[in-house]
Amino acid sequence: MSHQRNPRALLTPAMHHVLERMARAPHLPMHALTAQQARAAYEAGAGVLDIPPHKLARVEDLAIPVRDGSTIAARLYAPDHAPLPLLVYFHGGGFTVGSVATHDSLCRHLSHLAQCAVVSVDY
């Protein structure tokens, strides 16, 4: 079967295995959960596909001040102490699931590969 009819034909055997494991997992789909249940399920499974975290020159938790006097939590990742280009990262999750913590390894990886600073915004 061609990949035009079956996009999974292009996947590596390792990715096929990951998808099979996900399909067998005894979890309800996210849309069937309350927001609180979805957050807990996401947090519990966030590390399953994690890549080993890169060691970076800077990893720093920030509190970014905003107009109303409150702050927005964020985390800065940088492979060097020199001035660098900046990527602002907003994790997915529909404003319901995900956090700076669940995307820590990914942001470290992005910073390392792109040789730029990454600010991951927590919301």
Which role does the model predict for each range below?
Residues M1-I72, L76:
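A glycine/proline-hinged amphipathic helix-loop "lid/cap" segment
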Residues D61, L87, V118-S120:
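Conserved beta-strand scaffold positions in the cores of enzyme catalytic domains, especially
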Residues V66, G92, Y123:
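Active-site donor-binding loop signature of nucleotide-sugar glycosyltransferases
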Residues A74, P83-G93:
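Short beta-strand element of the alpha/beta-hydrolase
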Residues A74, V121-Y123:
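Fold-independent oxyanion-binding glycine-rich loops
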Residues Y89, G94-V97, T102, V118:
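Serine-hydrolase catalytic-loop signature spanning alpha/beta hydrolases and amidase-signature enzymes
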Residues A101-V121:
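Short amphipathic alpha-helix adjacent to the substrate-entry channel of hydrolases
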